[in-house]
Amino acid sequence: MTVAGCDIYHPSQSLLTGEEITFCGNISRSLKKDNYLVLETQAQGNIAWLPYPGQLRLQAYSHIANGSNSVMYWHWHSIHNAIESYWKGVLSHDFSENETYREAASIGADWKRIGTHLKNLQKKNRAAILLDNNSLTGLRLFPLKDLGNYSYNTVARWLGDALYHLNIEYDMISSAERDFSSYECLIVPALYSASEDLLTAISDSVKNGGHLITTFRSGFSDEQLKIYADTQPHILQECLGIHYDQYTYPVDVSVTLPDFMAHPSCSGHENAASDAGSSCSDESCTNSSKCLHWMDLVTCDTATPLFFYDHPVWKKYAAATVNQFGKG
């Protein structure tokens, strides 16, 4: 493959977030570590996705900002029969100009004028999400509660979308890579399947000064999905400073987040931050968050717990931890 290409479709109107454009664009840019082409994206789209005025322009520039060198719409005109009759193109069924057509034309006119300045935009990101197809397969076979085939992708999206909302740009890297030194922070979602040399490379990157964020279901089985027979997480136990040997689905379990993690942008937490030891003054704000889909029953070795489970039985187990390992 010389140039990566992709199709990116997503909700619109009041449900337009930019999350899908960023996540899918980052995957495409990272395939060749270079610019890519958006070969298909929605014009009018399906019935629920007809864009508000201005959204087509916002979406187009979002694609370019992620490193795309093109925005191509599916499709030119809306077709008149078969299954995609209501997957609307730039033109409707009457072939006449409409608001979507006029907005697309104005985008094209802009790019005819300034396109040379928008082509081949480059990024130098300091964070990367590591993706693994074997782990995707593993979590399809042994899914998280209620998520089924979407278990792995859902966890990856949680992390990617969190970075997006924090305005932290990131790359995607393959689990085939072993040198993570070009990134300050490596983010590893649900690495259910991993070879020992990959787990060692991740551990070494932290020891040498990198930062690692990882989730439950990481370091659990080898590349053939055979579960490792020692204490979990395999090889990463010392790096993370934790261990566990049991796990379950959370039922009526929640966690109480520290003030700085719960809603850091609300005025009540800003006031609390300036008054050591105080809690949020905004009565509508809550620090409680419900646990969903999976819980590892984690015991801290050298790690420091950030918070525990709110549950009469599981309260002794850490829900999230932080650890110093080597230089990282």
Task: Annotate each language-model stretch with its function.
Residues 2-328:
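Carbohydrate-binding surfaces of carbohydrate-active enzymes
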